[in-house]
Amino acid sequence: FALADCLLNKQPLDVIDIIKRSGLRGRGGGGFPTGLKWEFAHKQKSDIKYVVCNADEGDPGAFMDRSIMEGDPHSIVEAMCVCGYSISSSKGLVYIRAEYPLAINRLRIAINQARQYGLLGDHILGTEFSFDIEIRYGAGAFVCGEETALIHSMEGKRGEPTLKPPFPAESGYLGKPTNVNNVETLANIPIILTKGAEWFASIGTERSKGTKVFALAGKINNVGLIEVPMGTTLREVIYEIG
């Protein structure tokens, strides 16, 4: 699987290069190239770095991230480990809405299973790499979906965004370099590393690669989750699918 291949066969910059070539962009709304974000965090010199999964899904009617955490929490655990290896971090934090009890429970089970199998903790798969994950709970404030507000909330401060720079990759959680990706972004990492950057880049448009998950709700015929290639028009999503 992806984590074992990275730890045993690839250097951190090799992994980052694959993510860059895949063209994966942040799925939280900003659309920033994920590989570049990881590269920025990798370049920072610090004794401690953090990997943060933004699971604070606050958009009305949105349940994409919740469905991923309920259905495949292991993909998030694996992706966070891969990110930790890539940027030289040993600590992961998942910031999740307290209103998602099933997602929290399944994520907690996945983390404990990973520890039992030696996929989290000290010397993962017999290597020098150590990484562990803990869960932090959000109180439901919509603004905490923004990464600087999220970091403030995790620090016990008021969840207010701050101007960048500095970016979290330079000075984030507790003033240390911090890489923040949302759930859907991270869920793409294992499949990219398994099937290859070229495979992922073959889906979507020239500037936006891969697929996007949408939650359809409201006055339509078909409510629920859909996954479509990037570049699919809103007309197709609403009138042909919804």
Model-predicted segments: where are they?
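Conserved alpha/beta core surface patches that mediate binding of polyanionic ligands
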Residues: 22-46, 66-72, 194-199, 204
